Amino acid sequence: MDSAKVWRFISMYLSTTLAIFRYALHCFSTLNSLPSLLFKSMDTALSLYFRFCGLSPCTIDLDDQTTMHFWTSNHRRFDRPALVMVHGYGGASTWQFVHQVGPLSRKFNLYIPDLLFFGESYSCKSDRSDYFQASCVVRGLRGLGVERFAAYGISYGGFVAYRLAEMYPDAVEKLVIVNSGIGWSEEQRGEQLQKIGRHPAEIFVPKDPNDLRLLVNLSMHKPNWNGWAPDFLLREFINVMYNHCRREKIELIEHLLQKQPDSNIPVITQETLLIWGDQDKVFPVEIAQDIHRQLEPKSRLEIIKDTGHGANMESPDAVNSLIISFVSGSPNS
């Protein structure tokens, strides 16, 4: 075989080998990105569902340092109350209210903020307090032309919703708190931290699959996907949900922990509905009973059986029904 033929053979071999290598590399990179594509697709699907429920996203610049993102009802109906839904630590609002936005959008004009450092909401300011979160929510609502509303908050969102009622009594007509540790005593907080055995920031802002599994086990009472989900999926979930503004999210938790616990919460004037899962391992039902006693006679406590901390995810039908009857009903319903 002459040298020209040998060279053509070698060239063809190298070209074929390179093509196969590139194809294999492409397949591997695509396979590697499947978890990311999965969660991006889910996020897109959730946004489309919110739009299907008659909501649209909007972003409001509160000042040159703070931006807040909302989902709001497209067409306000004056025969419907306004309901502000405040999410907790489990990611942006679309992920947390997916089981509620459909039924509630048929009864209320909805305003759903992403709290600062979640979703597209952000602030360059150093304030990490629940008071600051509440003030930003109200400034955003006023920018949307909303002056009076009922507030509903879950977990961390319950802290913010309570501040809304405390700071803006003329704006907040009714209040719904779901599984939130407002008013827990120093003894209760110490007992819970000892039971959990980990710093709350390590759990509520997980950094690895084991942290996320612990968070799910604490939040849910009923069987869930936590046992079978592979590590690579959980890592991507953490990347999507928690790595954005990770430092700021941790600072929000640290602010709550640095505050001196006070079982005597500020008394508010609004009618208040407390909804609790009887199996809550984060904020036990005894906390709800203490809050109820302090807010009587203007509070009502509803305990949902066989439900954990994530009542909005585990028992959404019960939560939705209670919210609709309370907010739509008479002041003493």
What is each stretch, according to the model?
Residues 1-83, 106-108, 328-333:
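Alpha/beta-hydrolase fold catalytic core
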Residues 2-8, 297-333:
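Catalytic active-site module of serine/aspartate enzymes centered on a nucleophile-bearing elbow/loop
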Residues 20, 36-37, 186-194, 203-267:
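Conserved alpha/beta-hydrolase catalytic His-Asp/Glu region
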Residues 72-120:
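Conserved HGGG/HGGXW glycine-rich cap/lid loop of the alpha/beta-hydrolase fold
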Residues 131-149:
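Conserved acidic catalytic loop of the alpha/beta-hydrolase fold
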Residues 162, 166-167, 171-207:
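Flexible "cap/lid" loop of the alpha/beta hydrolase fold
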Residues 268, 274-276, 280:
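Short beta-strand/loop motif that positions the catalytic acidic residue
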Residues 270, 284-292:
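Short alpha-helix in the alpha/beta-hydrolase fold that links the catalytic acid
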